Amino acid sequence: MKHDLLKEFESIIMKQKLNENVKQKLLGNLLRLKKKKVNLMVIGATGCGKSSTINVLFGVEVAKVGTSVDPETMDIERYELDNLVVWDTPGLGDGKEADNRHSKRMIDKLYEKDKNGNLLIDLVLVILDGGSRDLGTSYELINNVIIPNLGENKENRILVAINQADVAMKGKYWNEEENAPEDELEEFLDRKVESVKKRIKEATRIEVESIYYSAGYKEEGYLQQKPYNLSKLLYYILQNTPEEKRVVYVQNLNQEEVMWKDNDDLKDYRKGILESILGAAVGVLAEGVANVVNGVANVVEGASDGISEGSDTGSDVGGAIGSIFGEVGETIGSAVGSVVGGVVGGVVGVVSSAVSSVCDTIGSLFGGWF
C-alpha cells in the first residue's frame, strides 16, 4: 500500500504541542518539501535494460504509468511518479540522422531550466549494457554530448551504471544460487568499471562515478532473476541528487524486500541510504527553527529534556527505519537515528519527536524492505 509521506509529516507536526511560530516554520518548510521535484534523466541504448531498471527501482511497469512524449523533445519519454519525473532518453546507434536528432534533443533538455532558473535535470543516469563489448557509441554520447552540456558540478550530475552484470562474460561465473558474481566475473566487472571511468576521464577530464549491477527480470509477471547491487545503485543515485530533494525518492521506491537484498557489500549502502533519507528530511524540516526557538520562551513542554528526548526518540525511529534492512539494518538505524535525533533535539525536543515519528512512518512504508 502506498502512503503519502508528506501528508504524514503534516499530520504529526499538527499534533505536536508546539509554539505557533515554530509550528508555522515547520509547516512552511514542509510546504517547500512538497514542492520539490526530482528530474532524473535515464539514457541508454536499446536493450541495455532502461525500462527494467526503472521498473525495479520504483516498483512500477513504466508502460502502465503516465507516459507522454514532450512535444519539443520528441523521442524523450516522460514518466511522472508523484514528484519524481523520469525522462527516458534513447542512446545512439540508430544511424547518423537519428543520432544527430537524439543528441540535439538531449542537449536541449540538459539546458532546460525550471521556473526558478535552475537546470531542470538533477541527475543523468547512463545505463550501459554489461554484455556488450562495443561501447563506442555510448562513450561518444557521454564524452561529446552529455558531459559538455551538464553545466557546473558535472561530476555530481552524472552516474554511469553497467547493467546486466550477470551476462558480462556470456553467463559464465555467475552464481545463480547466491545471485552474485564469482571471483572471475567480479574481477572482470571491476576492471570494466575502472576502464569506463578511465576512458571518460581521458576524454573529458571529468571523474565520474561508475558501478555495475543487474536489474534482474520477470517473465509473465513472475520474478525469474533477482536484482543484484540495486541498493548500491540507489545509494549512488541519492549521493548524486541534491540533498534537499532526496526525500522525493522515498515515496516511490519498490517495496519488495527481495529486490534490495543482494549486493556486493563493499560499502554499507544500508547505512548510507538511511543517512541520506533521514538527514535530508531532518535538515529541510529543521531549517531555521533554531532562530525561531531562540526568540520564544517555553517553546515546547519539556523542552529542557530536548537533547536526551530527541536522541532516544531518534534511536527508536532510526531502528524502525533500519528494520527495513533486516536485523543488521535495525542496529545501524538506531545508531544513525540517535545521532540525528540528538542533533535536532538540541534545537527542540518535540521537533525531533515530530520528525522522528515521520521517519518511523518511512520505515513502516516498506515493511521488510532491504
Question: Where do the model's predicted regions map?
Answer:
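Membrane-active amphipathic alpha-helices enriched in small hydrophobic residues
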Residues: 270-306, 310, 314-366
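Conserved GTPase G-domain substructure that encodes guanine base recognition and part of the catalytic core
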Residues: 1-85, 89-279, 342, 346, ...
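Eukaryote-biased recognition of electropositive, low-complexity segments
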Residues: 370
